[in-house]
Amino acid sequence: MINASGYLLSIIIPTYNNAELITATLASIHQSITDEVEVIIVNDGSTDLTEERIKAFYSEHSCNNVKYINHKNQGVAITRNVGLAHATGKYIGFIDSDDLVCKDYFTILLPKLREEKYDIVEFNLTRDINNLYQNKPGAKHALAEHEIILADDNYAPLLPTFRAGQWHLMTKIFHRDIIGNDRFEEHRRYEDMIFCPFQYFKCHCILKIENKLYYYRVNEKSITENIIDSDADSIFFAMRKMYNYVNKNKEKRTVATLMIINCFLEGRKLLRKKKGYYRYNESMLNDIQNALACCDTKIVKNKIILKMKYPHIDRSISEIRYKILSACKNLFFRKGF
């Protein structure tokens, strides 16, 4: 069904140098696709055979509901924004070009979207393809779902979602009115964390499907496998965006606290992985203390409060520990242990 406003669902696929995997991704998407769905592929200036693979796939699979856009390399955030600019569906979803969806992906999701009841439909992912949802008679993976209703400025139903902190963009289908004019932060990584939590605050009704409809392929190109210096800055940027939001929306403070704490812990972890210790810069130190000031500390563990209250001490202790461990390793190495 195609209505006057466009398709029911737009699927945006950003891609960059994924020639080896994109054919499998497209094949998984087209297992159960209907004419209610448009596919928007945005090639972020690939230098390998990605474009050739895409064209070869569609030369063998006739499909009138595909838009292919190729632009110079600008990063995944801008690439997704280009996809948003071309999307006409009432709902919008995202699939990464190296991942797979289960064969019942559209069979499950489209009936939910046709109801036009939900602001977000979310589901789970798996990193083990053997755990991907399969609709088999008598299978143990029966479809399980529940609604999250938000009313009268009561955001408590969002607490489990924010506590889990699973902001994977690919596991969410958004009503286009929820996204509105929001766009992905350009030239930032971890854009899912910067974007997704704020969409939930605009919702009235969310459908949570517990099953694993999406296979996330871990590969050497993923950001979790390739930490760069600016990654922690992006996480602290997300935290800053949230505490600034809370200062204007006090009624969302308790739920937002969970996201703020998640950002602090994730940013801290990235710094240690990249730098060897919690090497907060001055901007981060300022962000941490501003964030703590707007948190609902009743739901935060005391040891985390202390680390946020005294980030200079947290940094110094971790630096001393790092230097001692490094010296010991060097000593053992020289002595041939």
Task: Describe every region a protein language model picked out.
Residues 21-23, 48-57, 100, 104:
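Acidic helix N-cap motif at the loop->helix transition within catalytic regions
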Residues 28, 43-54, 73:
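A conserved acidic beta->alpha catalytic loop
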Residues 71-87, 108:
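Glycine-rich, basic loop-to-helix element that forms the pyrophosphate-binding segment
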